[in-house]
Amino acid sequence: MNKINFKKNGRGLVIVIALILSTATLSTASSIYENLYSFKPKQKIENPDPDFELKQKVKDRIKDVSTRAEAESRLVWVEVPVWRLKDGKKVSDTERFQILDVLANDVKEIFHEIHKGKEKFPIKNLIGYSWRGSFKSLHSTGQAIDLNPEENPQVNSNGKAIVGKSWQPGSNPYSIKPDGDVVRAFTKRGWIWGANFRTRDYMHFGFAEM
């Protein structure tokens, strides 16, 4: 160890000690930061699209559909729990509708989550499969669901309702809230809310729409 010659006066001694402590502190901090930022995971962490498998099933299921009969051969009836408004009170009920068969479990999970939510979102009208004579509409293949059309309208670029009346989230219990249970339950599973379309469609949720 090298000898350190301290000056006799107290001021010099204090300065030397401070320098030694400062150097030791910087060395310790450097070691800590090096350990923090030099960490490397043992293996690559995969982060796949959680909806990829289901999207592929849907794609395979509808690729050969060209007629109403073919579309309806791929549908199933589902029954889900819902809330209704009766005499100003929310009561539990069930709703039955048709949906593409490979989406049935997904749809059941969505409505069970909505039903268990604090919001207790009430459903007055629900449309699942509906033959529109065109495959531009996902309703024709059972890939879309509309909720309470009157209170969740489709509007043009000027905000004028094309279908339905008015959207009043927060004041009208049938209107879908952007940050509510309904939107969260659908979008977390890869469904797209029509409010994000250029022609906003607040009632509409479609699976794997681009």
Where are these regions (language model features)?
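Active-site-adjacent loop/helix surface patches within enzyme catalytic domains
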Residues: 109-146, 151-154
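Boundary at the C-terminal end of the N-terminal hydrophobic targeting segment
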Residues: 27-29
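Catalytic cores and adjacent binding grooves of peptidoglycan-active enzymes
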Residues: 136, 141-210
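Bacterial N-terminal signal peptides that target proteins for export
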Residues: 4-14
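Structured beta-strand-rich cores of soluble
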Residues: 33-64
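Intrinsically disordered, low-complexity boundary segments flanking structured domains
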Residues: 61-69, 133-136, 177-178
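Bacterial N-terminal signal peptides
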Residues: 15-24
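Active-site acidic/histidine clusters and adjacent loop/turn architecture
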Residues: 58-126
